[in-house]
Amino acid sequence: FGMWCIMCSPLLIGCDMNTIPDFSLKLLKNKELIALNQDVLGLQAHVVQHENESYVLVKDIEQKRGLTRAVALYNPSDQPCDFIVPFETLELGGEVKVRDLIKQEDLGKMKGEIRQTVQPHSVLICKVKAEKRLEPVCYEAEWAYLPCYDDLGKKSKPIVYVPDADCSGKMKISRLGGREENFA
């Protein structure tokens, strides 16, 4: 459910509400997760870190390029995963307040990185608020905002994909057009 919320997916319940377990019902009624899903920006999270079978996803909430973001530490594997996520990867700097949205509890203020263990087939969804926002150092094809995209080849310099081992999908987009609306 948390992954649906951070991805702004439609929230539908397809079960018998009379027999739903209390844990599941509590999760489906979690106001903080629902607020994340219904955030005014309506953005989907994108992958910023991928190691072995684990993923770190992030998105702006409340304000584009603001100090508050949502983060998912997603472990689809069969083993516990120890996450170490530098705040620079999340484009955040200074002291960062971290809140677990699933458990609805504050994890405190952190500096430098988030260190958490996530159990198999689980996710930790956090709201993070930083003292400052850092400039991104990597733009990836998976989440680039491309309103001027042209796949018909009619532009003089069409967008091209370029291999890049530092990108989670191992590819990035080049020649975005140099216009502000092309950047995430």
Model-derived segments and their meaning:
Residues L92-V98, G112, V118, S122-A184:
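Extracytoplasmic
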Residues F1-Q38:
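Aromatic/acidic polysaccharide-binding cleft in carbohydrate-active enzymes
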Residues M17-I20, F83-E88, M110-R115:
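Composition- and surface-driven signal marking solvent-exposed, interaction-prone regions
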Residues L11, K109, T117-Q119:
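Substrate-binding groove of N-acetylhexosamine-processing glycoside hydrolases
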Residues A45-T68, V137-G153:
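Surface beta-strand/loop "capping" patches
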Residues E88-L107:
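C-terminal accessory region downstream of the catalytic core in glycan-modifying enzymes
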Residues W4-M7, L12-G14, H50-L92, H121:
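Carbohydrate-binding surface patches
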Residues N37-A45:
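Extracellular low-complexity, O-glycosylation-prone Ser/Thr/Pro/Gly-rich "stalks"
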